[in-house]
């Protein structure tokens, strides 16, 4: 079919109309060498440090070394598609991540791309992952508790919103379990959680996703996975992606919990990059700026003042030690950056004391200011009692001829350690914790043999939650801001009533010579 002259002229006119005279310029370089996730590129004379570049294959990279003739680029993906001579294009932007509520309940990689098969994440805003931490004047003091639901931590090593608390210990001592329990305990507390897995096995990450799903905790959690299968550059940027997502929520006044699991593997990934980029190695072959690597990350955890939104980021970094050596390079670095540490011990774990927290080594430098008065007063003497117990235990090994006072300290300390044992994935609400600790403070566990303490604790909590009179006491505790003599007497009398029903159920009790329960101090004084 012949084309008419009028049709031809109309087509030409349409093409002329759409013709664009603008010329686009791209600054490009060429790959000189590539391998081990590092590409050396020449020709990118104006590229900036930390800028994104794109290879011919579509893979992204980030500039990390700026030399006289060459640029060292870390490849954010598979470097097997890159060959010598490929063009590399400047993107004139820094690495950024999508942020927003759309990321809740999702599992993403280090670049915040979804890997959970639930479809695309449609966010309207991206934020650069490398930022300066909030300044001194933008912050306020840490004075609100972040409840972990773990009795030993909330009682003796309390964590506040905006704090950085290190979890440190050997492998397989329950570090991740503490972090996961803390996420589970945030249910209904309006705290968003971000779990960043660095160098973990994919099977472990999948297991954590299943646990959070099972306990209905995934809906307020984002999981960032940079597994052992990922390249070192992706493991390096994963924590920064996580804290950037958290900062967006903090700016909107939300409270966020960020868990870095773990920063030992993060430091190893950065060491790998630095050595491949031919940077000079320092102690333990880590580069000189490995302290700054973690300090710039953890300083972004803060509690903002009201003028800046009033939100907070609480950071729980995890560090794995070798043979309990907390004086190694990375552990000492992170201990000095954080506001305290929770030290997990293998010997405690193997003896059945779980969570295996070593109270002597563990400390919280700012969290005690965040404790409620109800909690603070029931734990006032707990750490001292356990310190005395551990000291006496060492002496008791040398001989059996102990005076009554020493035997009382040893017996009470052993019972307190039993009270502190807690099954995994079952965090306690604060009221339950207060009731348990009340029994210890006022020696209401004196007549109970050590073997029955766990049963006693569980049945006591059940008694308080199912009895109409005790539910009134729980209501009073919930509303109270501080202890009064009347409130203490009320709780004491109800626990004594429970003791009267529980003690006869203990078999062979007549063989057990337990201590008597002392009267309340003011009642003894009035007598």
Curated annotation (Swiss-Prot):
CDD domains: ATP-synt_F1_alpha_C (cd18113), ATP-synt_F1_alpha_N (cd18116), F1-ATPase_alpha_CD (cd01132). Keywords: ATP synthesis, ATP-binding, Cell membrane, CF(1), Hydrogen ion transport, Ion transport, Membrane, Nucleotide-binding, Translocase, Transport. GO terms for molecular function: ADP binding; ATP binding; proton-transporting ATP synthase activity, rotational mechanism. Its main location: membrane. Produces ATP from ADP in the presence of a proton gradient across the membrane. The alpha chain is a regulatory subunit. Belongs to the ATPase alpha/beta chains family. This is ATP synthase subunit alpha. The lineage of its organism: Bacteria, Bacillati, Mycoplasmatota, Mycoplasmoidales, Metamycoplasmataceae. The gene is atpA.
């Amino acid at each position: 079919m012949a084309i008419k002259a009028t049709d031809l002229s109309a087509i030409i006119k349409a093409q002329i109309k759409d013709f664009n005279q603008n010329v686009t310029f791209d600054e490009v370089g060429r790959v000189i060498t590539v391998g081990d996730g590092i590409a050396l590129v020449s020709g990118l004379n104006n590229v900036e440090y930390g800028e994104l570049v794109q290879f011919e294959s579509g893979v992204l990279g980030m500039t990390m070394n700026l030399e006289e003739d060459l640029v060292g680029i870390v490849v954010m993906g598979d470097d097997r598609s890159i060959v010598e001579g490929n063009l590399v294009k400047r993107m004139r932007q820094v690495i950024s991540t999508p942020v927003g509520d759309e990321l809740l309940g999702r599992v993403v990689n280090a670049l915040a791309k979804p890997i959970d098969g639930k479809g695309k994440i449609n966010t309207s805003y991206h934020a650069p992952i490398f930022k300066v931490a909030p300044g001194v004047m933008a912050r306020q003091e840490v004075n609100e508790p972040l409840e972990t639901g773990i009795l030993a931590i909330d009682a003796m090593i309390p964590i506040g919103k905006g704090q950085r608390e290190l979890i440190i210990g050997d492998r397989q001592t329950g570090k991740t379990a503490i972090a996961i329990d803390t996420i589970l305990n945030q249910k209904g507390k309006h705290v968003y959680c971000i779990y960043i897995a660095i160098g973990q096995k994919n099977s472990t990450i999948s297991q954590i996703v299943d646990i959070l799903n099972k306990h209905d905790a995934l809906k307020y959690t984002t999981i960032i996975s940079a597994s052992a299968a990922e390249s070192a550059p992706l493991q390096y940027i994963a924590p920064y992606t996580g804290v950037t997502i958290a900062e967006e929520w903090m700016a909107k006044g939300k409270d966020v919990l960020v868990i870095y699991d773990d920063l030992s593997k993060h430091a190893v990934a950065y060491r790998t990059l630095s050595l491949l980029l031919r940077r000079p190695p320092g102690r333990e072959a880590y580069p000189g700026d490995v302290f700054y690597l973690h300090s710039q990350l953890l300083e972004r955890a803060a509690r903002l003042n009201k003028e800046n939104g009033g939100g907070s980021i609480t950071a729980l970094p995890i560090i794995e030690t070798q043979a309990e050596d907390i004086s190694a390079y990375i552990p000492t670095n992170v201990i000095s950056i954080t506001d305290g540490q929770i030290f997990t011990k293998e010997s405690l774990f193997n003896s059945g004391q779980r969570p295996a927290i070593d109270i002597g080594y563990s400390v919280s430098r700012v969290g005690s200011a965040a404790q409620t008065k109800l909690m603070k007063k029931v734990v006032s003497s707990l750490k001292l009692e356990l310190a005395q117990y551990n000291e006496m235990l060492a002496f008791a090994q040398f001989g059996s001829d102990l005076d009554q006072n020493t035997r009382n300290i040893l017996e009470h300390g052993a019972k307190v350690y039993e009270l502190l044992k807690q099954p995994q994935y079952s965090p306690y609400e604060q009221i339950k914790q207060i009731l348990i600790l009340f029994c210890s403070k006022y020696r209401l566990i004196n007549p109970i043999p050590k073997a029955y303490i766990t049963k006693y604790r569980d049945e006591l909590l059940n008694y308080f939650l199912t009895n109409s009179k005790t539910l009134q006491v729980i209501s009073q505790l919930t509303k109270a801001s501080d202890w009064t003599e009347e409130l203490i007497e009320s709780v004491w009398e109800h626990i004594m009533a429970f003791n009267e029903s529980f003690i006869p159920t203990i078999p062979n009790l007549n063989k057990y010579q337990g201590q008597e329960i002392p009267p309340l101090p003011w009642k003894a004084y009035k007598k």
